[in-house]
Design a protein with these regions (language model features):
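N-terminal Rossmann NAD(P)H-binding glycine-rich loop of SDR-like oxidoreductase domains
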Residues: 1-16
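Conserved beta-strand positions in the Rossmann-like core of class I SAM-dependent methyltransferases
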Residues: 19-22, 135
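N-terminal Rossmann-fold cofactor-binding loop
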Residues: 24-28
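NAD(P)H-binding glycine-rich loop region in Rossmannoid oxidoreductase-like domains
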Residues: 37-86, 90-93, 191
Length: 209
């Protein structure tokens, strides 16, 4: 979801930071309404582990799934760690200087929780590749339209979203549900700001004030 929201933000008429936006994925993207096709170049690669990244200044990676959707821990790791790292390495080799990547709240390479551990390992790996700027977004539960992307309905997630909306005043900001558009906004703005080094955006920091 965040990837779609990032694309919409990068192609909005008011955003003139990028003359050309390259879109890399396993299938051709559904472009946002009104997106200027003259500024878009789509690259489809069946294997993201072998994808070729064109020369660019910045790159945004918003790959992610769940263990239940992936089918196994190894399949989850292949996408959320291996594919993300492969793309980041290819981007660095292509001359990309600034990287924005979507992770998750709770990411910790030393965690006993498999999901959190893989996310943490991914963060450490991409941070060590030598980019001038790395921005890592750690959203809590994402609130957005999965159906529009052809993603399966996650019943437990839908129930959690309903509960979190009702109890929002009682939930710490870092663990409140957050919209995909808000994550995209914060991530793009932070990458464009270009602060040197590694910057982590916690979910509460990305929530609207």
């Amino acid at each position: 979801m965040v990837g779609r929201a990032v694309l919409a933000r990068l192609t909005a008429d008011k955003n003139s930071a990028y003359a050309v936006v390259h879109i890399l994925g396993r299938r051709a993207p559904e472009l946002p309404a009104g997106a200027p096709s003259a500024r878009l170049v789509s690259h489809v690669s069946k294997s993201l582990l072998e994808a070729q990244v064109p020369p660019a200044d910045d790159m945004f990676i918003a790959l992610g799934t769940t263990i239940s959707v992936a089918g196994s821990q190894s399949a989850f790791r292949a996408l959320d760690l291996d594919a993300v790292l492969a793309l980041a390495r290819a981007a660095r080799a292509a001359g990309v200087r600034r990287l924005g990547v979507v992770s998750a709240m709770g990411a910790d390479a030393g965690s006993q929780v498999f999901y959190n551990r893989v996310k943490g390992e991914m963060e450490l790996a991409v941070s060590a590749l030598g980019f001038d700027t790395v921005v890592i977004a750690r959203p809590s539960l994402l609130d957005g339209e999965r159906a529009a992307l052809g993603q399966p309905t996650r019943r437990g997630e839908q129930l959690a979203l309903k509960v979190m909306r009702v109890l929002k005043p009682l939930i710490p900001r870092n663990y409140q549900a957050i919209s995909d558009t808000q994550v995209a906004k914060a991530l793009v703005e932070a990458v464009l700001a270009g602060r040197p080094g590694v910057q982590i955006l916690l979910s509460g920091q990305m929530q609207p004030r």
